[in-house]
Amino acid sequence: LGLQLISGGNGLLDLLNLNQSTRLNLIRSFDPLADQCDVFFIDVPAGASDSSLSFVNASDKVLIVLVGEPTSFMDAYTMVKAAHVEGGVKDFSVVVNMAENEIQSKDTFQKFNKTASKFLDVKLRYVGYLPHSRALRSSIVKRKPLVVSDRKCRESLLFKSMSKELLSSPNNIASGITFFNKSAI
């Protein structure tokens, strides 16, 4: 059926300050899309606003995008902790972005996993990495997905591998409202 994406980009920053009733109504408003997509991505900004947490906690799977920088670690840890404490989320998938190579990405993940596991009863799963590359940068500038323009390049193959890992990861058991009882990532 396809893939749908709700971007957390600049145009949606006003969603950060929604009241609880409006957030719940917004989550329910996606119900008609249930038959129109196989996977539904919700991209929330870094940090742990009430709106971001509502969307994360309503999702079957949570994907944390981590960069090997202190601010990224702090934002990711804050989101993991808040989603776990407030929403009972226990399983998180992690992709390392802008890594030099796979070895560096796994090292970055291990450092984050060690810290998070020390203080939180959560399970973090490494699903892959994306390199710091010209191809990805060009794709962003052109606003054309790399997996469409060059399906066989290294980055496209990494996306495919990450997708398989993510889809095979366990779903979280939500205690509250969820997105149309279908995979919301």
Regions found by a protein language model. Name each.
Residues G9, S29-Q36, A58, A82-E86, ...:
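Conserved, well-folded catalytic cores of nucleic-acid-processing
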Residues V141-I185:
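NTP-binding/hydrolysis catalytic cores, primarily Walker-type P-loop NTPases
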Residues L120-V147, F159:
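Beta-strand-loop-alpha "switch" segments that mediate conformational coupling across diverse proteins
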Residues S21, D107, R154-L157:
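Conserved active-site and cofactor/substrate-binding residues in soluble primary-metabolism enzymes
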